[in-house]
Amino acid sequence: MADRNLRDLLAPWVAGLPARELREMTLDSRVAAAGDLFVAVVGHQADGRRYIPQAIAQGVAAIIAEAKDEATDGEIREMHGVPVVYLNQLNERLSALAGRFYHEPSENMRLVAVTGTNGKTTTTQLLAQWSQLLGETSAVMGTVGNGLLGKVIPTENTTGSAVDVQHVLASLVAQGATFGAMEVSSHGLVQHRVAALKFAASVFTNLSRDHLDYHGDMAHYEAAKWMLYSTHHHGQAIVNADDEVGRRWLASLPDAVAVSMEGHINPNCHGRWLKAEAVEYHDRGATIRFASSWGDGEIESRLMGAFNVSNLLLALATLLALGYPLTNLLKTAARLQPVCGRMEVFTAPGKPTVVVDYAHTPDALEKALQAARLHCAGKLWCVFGCGGDRDKGKRPLMGAIAEEFADIVVVTDDNPRTEEPRAIINDILAGMLDAGQVRVMEGRTEAVTNAIMQAKDNDVVLIAGKGHEDYQIVGTQRLDYSDRVTAARLLGVIA
């Protein structure tokens, strides 16, 4: 379908269409231009069919719209000389449509999906870094942004729309990408945004409380994640056997690679496996000895904490499953860099060690604090808040975790959005046994500054919740703010 025309694009579903050339594909009538294909989907907030007249006025070449029902699937109408094709269950078909439009980019690179509550960003970054060290031209897609390694452009969502995903992949292929590592969110799976992608491998990191404002309960959240393996072309399956959900899934995925730090591996049951034999944590990171069905080895890592060792082992197992030689992986492992805003360490002589992390769920906060404790000779500080207009149930849980695992807790704002900041803080304090010992400071800049200035040089200050983000949402305003930049400025170093 070299010239991208309407007849060839819809050939698997609809016959009798004109071979009208199409310039670009868009879901947004505001940016639709002459020669484009406008796709009018029925979304959660708006019905795209209402904007068909606007798209026609802007000169689009053709329109695909959601059909009223199964009976009208494939119906073709003409409005002001523009063909309008109606398809039933358009959202479910959108990934396949966009895949055809952009010439199936996922088939022209090695694309790895990474899903799970925590660890997606670090694991995708490690996969991209490591594969590039082995000669690939690697790209990432996810929370931090999309692009070739080192040229990432920030994005709004972990997983973009079905059209965005295929468009970005096509752009990456055009730039020469041969390997891609992509974060896949539960929203993205439920909303069919990656439905037609051909993954070479799919990685599951872990599952813990998050997004229950969207999914309702943990059962539905787990079901959303499981879709990657049950309804998608998942390729090689790599699963964290230390996670209870992961162990359950491994029973249904007999060909999966089981990965463990805690001994949850039975070589007689798991044909392919990788497990940590010994891990030594030190001020520079960790030394990891491992065994696997591919052979044994040792890695010096600059990453902090046990959960990052798990992320590293998942990345290693994935690349082994894809056929990269163990000897080459071991030779290049020491060159892997820490990930921006993910247990990122800032140090300066005579100042406390500051760690900036994206932890914004109960499980992630606990793991971040446990990781920081491994590298802390003095007091462990925790500065954090919770996002407004999001799952309120996790707030007291995170308060309890901070109180249990940190020596000094500073509760502040995260992204309060349209909620009253003090109300969010009170929800956090409600989970604590002795809230009177907690330091409360609403302004995040002031809270971070106060903690770093008061901490001693052998203390560790964990600033949790925002990680790589360079903004704060207050009300409906997006304000410039970065934990990384604030910490670096106070320590007199460069972020």
UniProtKB/Swiss-Prot annotation:
Motif (Meso-diaminopimelate recognition motif) on chain: 414-417
GO cellular component, one term: cytoplasm
Binding of ATP, residues: 116-122
E.C. numbers: 6.3.2.13
Enzyme class: ligase
Modification sites for N6-carboxylysine: 225
Residues noted as binding UDP-N-acetyl-alpha-D-muramoyl-L-alanyl-D-glutamate in the record, renumbered to the chain: 27, 29, 44-46, 157-159, 185, 191, 193
Keyword Nucleotide-binding included in the entry's annotation: yes
Processing and modification events after translation: Carboxylation is probably crucial for Mg(2+) binding and, consequently, for the gamma-phosphate positioning of ATP.
Pathway note: Cell wall biogenesis; peptidoglycan biosynthesis
Stored InterPro entries: Mur-like_cat_sf (IPR036565), Mur_ligase_C (IPR004101), Mur_ligase_C_dom_sf (IPR036615), Mur_ligase_cen (IPR013221), Mur_ligase_N (IPR000713), MurE/MurF_N (IPR035911), UDP-N-AcMur-Glu-dNH2Pim_ligase (IPR005761)
Catalytic activity, reaction form: UDP-N-acetyl-alpha-D-muramoyl-L-alanyl-D-glutamate + meso-2,6-diaminopimelate + ATP = UDP-N-acetyl-alpha-D-muramoyl-L-alanyl-gamma-D-glutamyl-meso-2,6-diaminopimelate + ADP + phosphate + H(+)
Keywords associated with the record: ATP-binding, Cell cycle, Cell division, Cell shape, Cell wall biogenesis/degradation, Cytoplasm, Ligase, Magnesium, Nucleotide-binding, Peptidoglycan synthesis
Its job: Catalyzes the addition of meso-diaminopimelic acid to the nucleotide precursor UDP-N-acetylmuramoyl-L-alanyl-D-glutamate (UMAG) in the biosynthesis of bacterial cell-wall peptidoglycan.
Family affiliation: Belongs to the MurCDEF family. MurE subfamily.
The name this protein goes by in its record: UDP-N-acetylmuramoyl-L-alanyl-D-glutamate--2,6-diaminopimelate ligase
Organism the protein comes from: Salmonella choleraesuis (strain SC-B67)
